């Protein structure tokens, strides 16, 4: 039976347990994703409390981390989503994304509407990918792909 969370408390606590177990076992999110049939971004988001995992994926990850049956059930529950409090993020990495949206949010909105019309980009029918590439000028660059289905506004 599908279960749904009414608060973020249980999933936040499980996320803390997951991060600690991951560190103790010296595992990467890529290693935890292996054998799930899902993307690294989706599994990572699920382990951090933002998605529900299918039963087989939940068991696979729980076995790798040494989590109990209650954790397997909780990993399958639909979370109350949203990881940023109702304030400006203070973590430097998350803040940079916030800053990007502050600077480019209206540009993204204008370009999406110009190319697609009135509507939104889905965060449900969505894919996320993060790649590290060499910068020709030295160092590394982050290539982040946000791939969401366009959903038009429908007059009623």
From Swiss-Prot:
Pfam families in alphabetical order = Cyanate_lyase, CYNS_N
A single GO BP term for this record reads: cyanate metabolic process
Location of the active site: 96, 99, 122
Identify the InterPro entries for this entry.
Cyanase, Cyanate_lyase_C, Cyanate_lyase_C_sf, CYNS_N, Lambda_DNA-bd_dom_sf
Q: Which UniProt keywords apply?
A: Lyase
EC number(s) stated in the UniProt entry for this protein: 4.2.1.104
Write out the coiled-coil annotation as residue ranges.
Answer: none
Q: Which chain regions cross the lipid bilayer?
A: none
Class of enzymatic activity (EC top level): lyase
Which reaction equation describes what this protein catalyses?
A: cyanate + hydrogencarbonate + 3 H(+) = NH4(+) + 2 CO2
- Highest taxon listed in the record's lineage: Bacteria
GO MF terms held by the record: cyanate hydratase activity; DNA binding
Task performed by this protein: Catalyzes the reaction of cyanate with bicarbonate to produce ammonia and carbon dioxide.
| Family to which the UniProt record says this protein belongs | Belongs to the cyanase family.
**What protein name is recorded for this chain?**
Cyanate hydratase
Q: Which organism is it from?
A: Burkholderia lata (strain ATCC 17760 / DSM 23089 / LMG 22485 / NCIMB 9086 / R18194 / 383)
Q: What is the lineage of its organism?
A: Bacteria, Pseudomonadati, Pseudomonadota, Betaproteobacteria, Burkholderiales
Q: Which gene encodes it?
A: cynS
């Amino acid at each position: 039976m599908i279960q749904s969370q009414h608060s973020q408390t249980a999933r936040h606590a499980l996320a803390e347990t997951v991060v600690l177990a991951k560190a103790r076992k010296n595992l990467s999110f890529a290693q935890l994703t292996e054998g799930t049939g899902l993307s690294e971004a989706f599994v990572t988001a699920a382990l951090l409390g933002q998605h529900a995992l299918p039963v087989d994926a939940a068991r696979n990850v729980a076995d790798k981390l040494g989590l109990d049956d209650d954790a397997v059930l909780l990993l399958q529950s639909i979370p109350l989503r949203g990881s940023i409090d109702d304030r400006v993020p203070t973590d430097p990495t998350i803040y940079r994304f916030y800053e990007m949206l502050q600077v480019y949010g209206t540009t993204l909105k204008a370009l999406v509407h110009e190319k697609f019309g009135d509507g939104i980009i889905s965060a449900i029918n969505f894919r996320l990918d993060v790649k590290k590439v060499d910068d020709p000028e030295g160092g590394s660059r982050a290539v982040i792909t946000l791939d969401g289905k366009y959903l038009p506004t429908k007059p009623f």
